[in-house]
Swiss-Prot record:
This is Eukaryotic translation initiation factor eIF-1. Additional factor that functions in concert with eIF-2 and the initiator tRNA in directing the ribosome to the proper start site of translation. The gene is SUI1. Coiled coil: none annotated. The factors eIF-1, eIF-2, eIF-3, TIF5/eIF-5 and methionyl-tRNAi form a multifactor complex (MFC) that may bind to the 40S ribosome. Interacts with NIP1. Belongs to the SUI1 family. PANTHER family: EUKARYOTIC TRANSLATION INITIATION FACTOR SUI1. PROSITE patterns: SUI1. GO terms for molecular function: ribosomal small subunit binding; RNA binding; translation initiation factor activity; translation initiation factor binding. The modification N-acetylserine is found at residue 2. It comes from Saccharomyces cerevisiae (strain ATCC 204508 / S288c) (Baker's yeast). Pfam families: SUI1. Keywords: Acetylation, Protein biosynthesis, Translation regulation.
Length: 108
């Protein structure tokens, strides 16, 4: 006979809070620059996609400038000028075939 109630349980912990589950999300964030200027950052794009080609299409479709930044902790991040969060989310779903549940939009 085993006693099952001796396990530690945190009632305030988020359900499904593991490191592997958070790594498969695509995070779209907005950052404030000078005054009204903003940057949109896209982090966590899966490895099978070519970030340079995605950036080229995003820049052309949204008529904005952008670049790819290499971060030691976060990996490669796409930066776009302006608030492009909704457009990037729609692009990821329609063009890349990603699911909306895997995309997190942060900011304001």
């Amino acid at each position: 006979m085993s006693i099952e109630n001796l396990k530690s349980f945190d009632p305030f912990a988020d359900t499904g809070d593991d490191e592997t589950a958070t790594s498969n999300y695509i995070h779209i964030r907005i950052q404030q620059r000078n005054g009204r200027k903003t940057l949109t950052t896209v982090q966590g794009v899966p490895e099978e996609y070519d970030l340079k080609r995605i950036l080229k299409v995003l820049k052309k479709d949204f008529a904005c400038n952008g670049n790819i930044v290499k971060d030691p902790e976060m990996g490669e991040i796409i930066q776009l000028q302006g608030d492009q969060r909704a457009k990037v989310c729609e692009f990821m779903i329609s063009q890349l075939g990603l699911q909306k549940k895997n995309i997190k939009i942060h900011g304001f």
